[in-house]
Amino acid sequence: MAVWLWPAAETEPQRPNSAADPAAATDPAPDPYLAACQTYYTGADGREYHVFTAMTPSIEGRTDPVGYRSELIPAGGTVDFPATVMVEDAVTQDYAAEDFAALLDSWDVSVTAPEGVSRVKLWDAEEETPESPALLYRRLRADPTCTHNEVVWTLRMKSGDVLHLTMTVEFEEQQALRITPEDAPLETAQELQALLDRLAEEYDADTSITVELPDVTYDAPVSVGCAVTLKGSGTAFAAPVTVMPLSDTERCHAYVRFSEVSFEGDGSGTGVTARAPTYLENCRVTGWDVGALAVNGGWVYLHGGYIGGNGVGARYDSAYSNSYTYTIRHIDFLNNTTALELLCLPPNSYAALDDCRFRGNGTDVYNPGGYRIEVNNGTEVTL
């Protein structure tokens, strides 16, 4: 994530329904993107359907039409999200994909872009499609060179009617801010907290911030209230860390990433509490009552690392988050009383354990909600 600095000769593109003249904004024009991405259709069965493009799953299970998406992408990075066609009963607003599908003869999806502009890539989402209420489901991947694309769905009905739905997507490269111990004092938890507080005041999620931490142990609680990557080099947190709720911008999701750090407890407390999307990449979490905890609004992405010697290794108790994944990948859960707890997940969620090892735990997975669990790529676990 990083701020996009607009050249002096340019102005920031107007968002849908925006107006340069404040007076004109009091009577906004219809949103052309929303007009292009949805339609109402009366089927041969006499039922009226609301058909629209969207990205799902959405926060708290709600699905809204999406005709325009703009996002900043770090240099060399990509974004990946669902691109779907949804169908609702126009009166009850209940999902109606199955009934509408009986009226559908064929369909296709295409991507158009100006000359010289890269195109986003679409592919089947085999794992997610059965869990989704969408009529049509693809995943979309883009990089910063996909500056302006139109994703066009064409639906051909058995009646001979043809429906066109268009979602416009725009992506640009972010600029980045990197802070090292040479740039700011980072030897103590108090110094780190002061830096994080300053970053929260001066930047939003449009700025890609990386803080390179020194080889120290932070022995006081730390609260993270900004979108940031904290990259360790022998760094340890020996007191609880809390990721506070963060605000997305129009073009960036806000999240916190911990990379190659250790969370070392004394048998009590919670190592990391995530009230916003939080990545733990190649981290060690040891010696806590609860090692990592996701609560409402937050999520914990576990990608590589070791979670051992905790009362509960990782606990998911989050009914909603604007960003989450199904996969826990390359994690060794060793010698925890309970390795993984699935108390509450967002709607239609499940857990996919990919190349994980569960050994020496009292209970490998506690799943009172009965969520679906997939075991992939040699994962060793007792369910």
Predicted regions and their residues:
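Extracellular/luminal low-complexity segments enriched in Ser/Thr/Pro
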Residues: 131-146
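Solvent-exposed, low-complexity, repeat-rich "mucin-like" stalks and linkers
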Residues: 31-111
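Low-complexity "stalk/linker" and mucin-like segments enriched in Ser/Thr/Pro/Ala/Gly
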Residues: 66, 100-134
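N-terminal extracellular ligand-recognition/capping segment immediately after the signal peptide
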Residues: 184, 189, 206-228, 233-240, ...
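Right-handed parallel beta-helix/beta-spiral solenoid domain characteristic of secreted/periplasmic
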Residues: 228-273, 284, 383
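Right-handed parallel beta-helix/beta-solenoid
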Residues: 168-196
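All-beta strand scaffolds that present successive hydrophobic residues in beta-strands
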Residues: 229-232, 256-258, 278-282, 299-304, ...
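Surface-exposed loop/turn segments connecting beta-strands in extracellular beta-rich domains
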Residues: 219-221, 238-240, 261-267, 286-290, ...
